[in-house]
């Protein structure tokens, strides 16, 4: 089974360097264009999906609707971006100015509990629930419209062995981990075969 993780297009929060979190922000005009473009790329590859999921946050649902307009997706909260609590909607630069080092340290640890959000363990736990769910379902090709943080979390769990019961499985595409940028509307392909996950393509349409 192949899992295509597709990041949403540029959102209003992306365009202002703000925390989005679970706020229902929309795509920008640029983001809408990115969504249509990735749909064209998928069609050029003759890719069809047995099942499609999307985060239940607006920017991911909009991306699905624009990229694959003649398809239906199941919404799920399990692949939402990390919950940043009351930081949602606030510009990162303003948070730095106001809170300084304590904020930067928490952000670096991916720990937003101070503001009523999640930490990294909580975030990964619900994403892993989604992964374990799709392992049990029928279908050879699955798409999930989600968020950059979700995609990086899946990658981290692959490198750490969490996805594979403690067995790290190296990437087979010749890219070092620090090189893994995750642009808006990037497409990232993971494969589950014989009980193990592998990374098959990172940002597959990158020029």
Describe the predicted segments one by one:
Residues 3-62, 118-127:
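Loop-to-helix element that buttresses phosphate recognition and phosphoryl-transfer chemistry
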Residues 37-104:
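Phosphate-coordination/substrate-recognition cap region in phosphate-metabolizing enzymes
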Residues 101-122:
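Short glycine/proline- and acidic residue-enriched helix-loop micro-motifs
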Residues 45-48, 134-140:
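Glycine-rich phosphate-binding loop signature in dinucleotide/nucleotide-binding domains
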Residues 76, 82-94, 156-207:
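Acidic, low-complexity terminal tails and accessory targeting/binding regions
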Residues 11, 150-151:
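Short active-site segment of divalent metal-dependent hydrolases/proteases
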Residues 3, 140-148:
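Generic beta-sheet signal
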Residues 41, 66, 70, 133, ...:
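Active-site catalytic microenvironments for nucleophilic, acid-base chemistry
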């Amino acid at each position: 089974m192949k899992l295509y993780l597709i990041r949403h297009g540029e959102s209003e929060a992306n365009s202002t360097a703000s925390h989005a979190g679970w706020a229902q922000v929309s795509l920008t005009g640029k983001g809408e264009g990115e969504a249509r473009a990735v749909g064209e790329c998928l069609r050029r590859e003759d890719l069809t999906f047995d099942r499609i999921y999307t985060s239940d946050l607006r920017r991911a649902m909009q991306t699905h609707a624009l990229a694959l307009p003649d398809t239906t997706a199941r919404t799920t909260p399990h692949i939402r971006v990390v919950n940043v609590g009351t930081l949602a909607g606030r510009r990162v630069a303003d948070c730095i100015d106001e809170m300084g080092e304590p904020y930067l340290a928490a952000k670096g640890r991916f720990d937003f509990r101070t503001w009523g959000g999640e930490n990294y363990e909580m975030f990964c736990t619900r994403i892993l629930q989604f992964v374990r769910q799709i392992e049990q379902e029928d279908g050879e090709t699955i798409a999930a419209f989600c968020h950059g943080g979700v995609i990086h979390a899946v990658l981290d769990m692959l490198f750490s062995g969490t996805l594979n019961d403690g067995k790290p499985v190296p990437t087979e595409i010749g890219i070092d981990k620090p090189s893994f940028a995750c642009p808006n509307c990037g497409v990232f392909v993971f494969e589950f075969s014989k009980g193990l996950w592998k990374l098959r393509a990172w940002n597959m349409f990158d020029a």
